[in-house]
Amino acid sequence: MILIEHILGNVKKDPVWQAKLKDATFDLLILDQREAQKSRCRKSSTQGLDLGISLDRHVVLADGDVLAWDEENNVAVVVQINLRDVMVIDLSELKSRSPDELIKTCFELGHALGNQHWKAVTKHNEVYVPLTVATSMMDSVMRTHGFQHLPFRFVKGAEILPQLSNSEARLLFGGAEDSDTHVHVDSPLDEPHGSGLHVHAIHSHGDGHSHSHSHDHDHDHRHDDHDHKH
């Protein structure tokens, strides 16, 4: 096993390493969302190198990090992180609103995101939400709930990761693929039993069973026979 205790550089951000590895062969260490949050793990590269990652606890691997460099054979071990895309909601424009408007908008946005069971992290006047459904569906949720005045965009998760602390990264990416998927897109003018769009994924419960459901009524569920956990 090859022990990796330090990151040499980043081929995507560091011009020196970009030039050095211009004609090099990349032996990729491919990490998924959960693995990317760990400062310690053991995994093989695409060319079969047995790598033991043992970094300082505050260090998080980033896409393009160079972990090893065999100059003689012109081969570099480089990290490739496969993260979900992220919706970035810019809250900066709320600074110009009245305190009442700011509080109301933030409360309603939090309620809308929570109603979809979407994970979120707020940082630098932005809200980061990992994609669990199609971007068109997330776009519809934002616009239907009246947040079209808040600029939002979709970016690669790897662009957001360096800005996050370990705990924030775990919250945003750790197990995002296991989140229950709820999409409710209703017009404010819809009747209680109107034709608004409802998409529900399967819910897993602690008692080992699961169920799926779709309906044309409001999102107000009562289950008397068991707790409804997410």
Curated annotation (Swiss-Prot):
Pfam families, per the entry: UreE_N (PF02814)
Gene symbol of the encoding locus: ureE
Highest taxon in the source lineage: Bacteria
Role summary: Involved in urease metallocenter assembly. Binds nickel. Probably functions as a nickel donor during metallocenter assembly.
Coiled-coil boundaries: none
Subcellular locations according to the entry: Cytoplasm
Region (Disordered): 182-230
GO biological process: protein folding
Protein name: Urease accessory protein UreE
Principal cellular location given in the protein's record: cytoplasm
SUPFAM superfamilies, A to Z: Urease metallochaperone UreE, N-terminal domain (SSF69287)
GO CC annotations on file: cytoplasm
Keyword Cytoplasm tagged: yes
GO MF terms held by the record: nickel cation binding; unfolded protein binding
Alphabetized UniProt keyword annotations: Chaperone, Cytoplasm, Nickel, Nickel insertion
Presence of keyword Lipoprotein: no
Species name: Yersinia mollaretii
Basic and acidic residues: compositionally biased ranges: 182-193, 204-230
Family: Belongs to the UreE family.
InterPro entries with a match to the protein in the record: UreE, UreE_N, UreE_N_sf
